[in-house]
Curated annotation (Swiss-Prot):
It is found in: Cytoplasm. This is Uroporphyrinogen decarboxylase. It catalyses: uroporphyrinogen III + 4 H(+) = coproporphyrinogen III + 4 CO2. GO terms for cellular component: cytosol. Its main location: cytoplasm. Pathway: Porphyrin-containing compound metabolism; protoporphyrin-IX biosynthesis; coproporphyrinogen-III from 5-aminolevulinate: step 4/4. Keywords: Cytoplasm, Decarboxylase, Lyase, Porphyrin biosynthesis. InterPro entries: UROD/MetE-like_sf, Uroporphyrinogen_deCO2ase_HemE, Uroporphyrinogen_deCOase. It comes from Bacillus pumilus (strain SAFR-032). The record marks D78 as: Transition state stabilizer. The gene is hemE. GO terms for biological process: protoporphyrinogen IX biosynthetic process. Transmembrane segments: none annotated. It comes from the Bacteria.
Length: 352
């Protein structure tokens, strides 16, 4: 029997701003699309089968840890996973994304939404987490959920949108109906994350992919109170809490106000700029994923710049500003991870 690897808690330490031997790294969408092993799996099984069979899902979740040497695993699931359980039928269509044939657009639609019971509705999610825990994954496992605004935008628009005009129209014209939906989705998020933590995740990230469509004033009025409730109620779970959104640099100070541990940055705002804005909590990010399609010299230069900014504090985790593209080479991600670890370890050693 092979020797069990020691548990790597670098990511968890960085979430709290504790000293580490190197900067921890993991990548959004690190599991799946860019890996040949995953593509081979997709030739045998559909996405539904992979995500609903704990053994397959655990395998996909584990792959980047074994191949790239990242400091955390993130559960391989979709943010849409809990919606069918509350009465919203979702189909993931190739080349489009989540599609909802019966959008949620009225108060009556919202009132018909049910409650989430993870043990009954999503046993395959919890079984996957427990399987990874039993297999002694040697890095923390990150759970996640979609934020109420992003979930609502899919539910109201019926799928991806460029301008979210139906979503924003409901928010502006029927604020009470909007808040009813926000609170129902907040309840779902809290219940879902609690179940994931109970099953064994060591941290979680809330993805608000499309919240950048709102200005700061509207965010504070229509979204922030709900996010405050989510993080306040989940604080008792005693695991690091991460917030991330796309194109939302104008909202990071509002995120920083929330009782969370880590603020995720996309590539539009540098780490230095975020610190100048007064963000003292742990920052996570923020290499533009497109750069991973460039020559290695370019990747190294950009990664070094981000590390130099991030390492001014122990409150830093290296990630991308968005998810890994399908055409990124796994070798590039391995090389990047090694560079992050080696470069940051030398810096930290020399600064002792």
């Amino acid at each position: 029997m092979g020797k069990t690897k020691a548990f790597n808690d670098t990511f968890l330490k960085a979430c709290k701003g504790e000293k580490t031997d190197h900067v921890p790294a993991w990548y959004m969408r690190q599991a799946g699309r860019s890996q040949p092993e995953y593509r081979a799996l997709k030739e045998k099984y559909g996405l539904f089968e992979i995500t609903h069979q704990p053994e397959l899902c655990a395998y996909v979740t584990r792959l980047p840890v074994e191949q790239y040497g990242v400091d955390a695993a993130i559960l391989y699931k979709d943010i849409m996973t809990p919606l069918p359980a509350i009465g919203v039928d979702v189909e993931i269509k190739n080349g489009i994304g989540p599609v909802i044939d019966s959008p949620i657009r009225t108060k009556a639609d919202i009132e018909r939404l049910g409650e989430l019971h993870p043990e009954e509705d999503l046993p395959y999610v919890l079984d996957t987490i427990q399987l990874l825990t039993k297999e002694q994954l040697n890095v923390p496992l990150i759970g996640f959920a979609g934020a109420p605004f992003t979930m609502a935008s899919y539910m109201i628009e019926g799928g991806p949108s460029k301008n979210y005009h139906k979503t924003k129209a409901l928010m502006y014209s029927e604020p009470e109906t909007w808040m009813l939906l926000m609170n129902k989705l907040a309840d779902m998020t809290i219940t879902y994350i609690r179940a994931q933590v109970k099953a064994g995740v060591s941290a979680f990230q809330i993805f608000d992919s499309w919240v950048g469509a709102l200005n700061a004033a509207d965010y504070r009025t229509f979204i922030k109170p709900v996010m405050q409730r989510i993080f306040t109620e989940l604080k008792s779970e005693n695991v690091p809490m991460i917030m991330y959104g796309v194109g939302a640099s104008h909202l990071v100070k509002d995120w920083h106000d929330l009782p969370l541990d880590v603020v995720g940055l996309d590539w539009r705002m540098s780490v230095d700029e975020a610190r100048k804005e007064g963000l003292t909590k742990t920052l996570q990010g923020n290499l533009d994923p497109t750069i991973l399609l460039s020559p290695w010299e370019v990747i190294e230069e950009r990664a070094k710049d981000i590390l130099d900014q991030g390492m001014k504090s122990d409150h830093f985790i290296f990630n991308l500003g968005h998810g890994v593209f399908p055409d990124v080479s796994p070798d590039t991600l391995k090389k990047l991870t090694d560079f992050i670890h080696d470069y940051s370890a030398k810096h930290k050693k020399s600064s002792i």
